[in-house]
Amino acid sequence: MNDGWFERRTHQWTEWTPQRLVELKRDTGTTVSLVVPARNEEATVGRIVSRVREELIGRVPLLDELVVMDSDSTDATAREAAEAGARVHRTVDVRPDLGHHHGKGEALWKAQFVTGGDVLVFLDADLVEWDTHFVSGLLGPLLQDPGVELVKAFYDRVLDREDARPTHEGGRVTELVARPTLALRWPALSGVVQPLSGEWAIRRSLLRELTVPTGYGVELATLVDTHLRRGVDAIAQVGMGLRGHHHQSLHGLGAMATELLAVADRRAGAGPGADAVELHQYGTGGKTMTTEVGLVERGPASRVGPPPDRPEGPCAREVAGRC
């Protein structure tokens, strides 16, 4: 673990009131976009959007825009989000000239083309135990210290089990894949409590320079790449208290783990060169289940030209959207 980093860069959300954050936001001239990537989350996304709009746009003007990126949903996710007051973009419709890939990382990468904030805050759409400080708390280190460029949330997790007691453990993939990988390859990041947390914030100026995996590897890749490009002190973390969300099956986590290992291998110079691999898993009686795991990574958004129907040259930079 990097000497002294944990003490310097670990915070609690209670250190900043929303009113204080608004003052810092005004003093620094910073604009903030909240992005909620969602796929088939009709049961939760509307409540999340409504609550955030009420507290962080209506009660205090902390957010400049709230965008839901609908990632190939087959349910009413888009309708629920729009009716709750979000601006909704279907990922497949954003910059169609650049093609489309399935996955969370694709939604976050494409969000750069439909948002305008200096800071992007990402919030998962499947939360069931949470509050709006999951958003506001992430902004404290960024608004207070210009040297901070990436902020990760950490929390006590409420697991889907009968006793429902909070635990300091990370998720299964965090404890079995991400944390050991960091310990072996990037030990300076071992102090990051929740390296795969879906709640994080980043300066646009940094994100637009990063390569972004289109799937679940986006959080690990962003963490490692920030460390490699800016140093560990550009990263901070904020404790948020309790967090509850829906969990994937063990087989589903196998695909996630595969993506994370690919992210780590690429950043360690060990490959892989393929855009996808086949993951073979086994069920009852040795029944074979084969999943194609996508390993595509999007290049830096800063290198992407304007859409074919727009002229070359700078566009007006508005919080309502970007060219």
Regions found by a protein language model. Give the residues of each.
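The conserved acidic donor/metal-binding loop of glycosyltransferases
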Residues: 124-130
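N-proximal low-complexity "stem/linker" segments adjacent to membrane-targeting elements
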Residues: 1-54
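Conserved catalytic loops of nucleotide-sugar-dependent glycosyltransferases that act on lipid-linked
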Residues: 168-263
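Acceptor/aglycone-binding surface of glycosyltransferases and processive sugar-polymer synthases
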Residues: 96-104, 108-110, 130-204
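Short aromatic/hydrophobic "clamp" motif used to bind/position activated sugar donors
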Residues: 120
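A conserved acidic beta->alpha catalytic loop
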Residues: 70-79
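Conserved donor nucleotide-binding strand/loop of the catalytic core
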Residues: 64, 78-106
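Terminal low-complexity segments of carbohydrate-biosynthetic enzymes
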Residues: 1-7, 51, 250-323
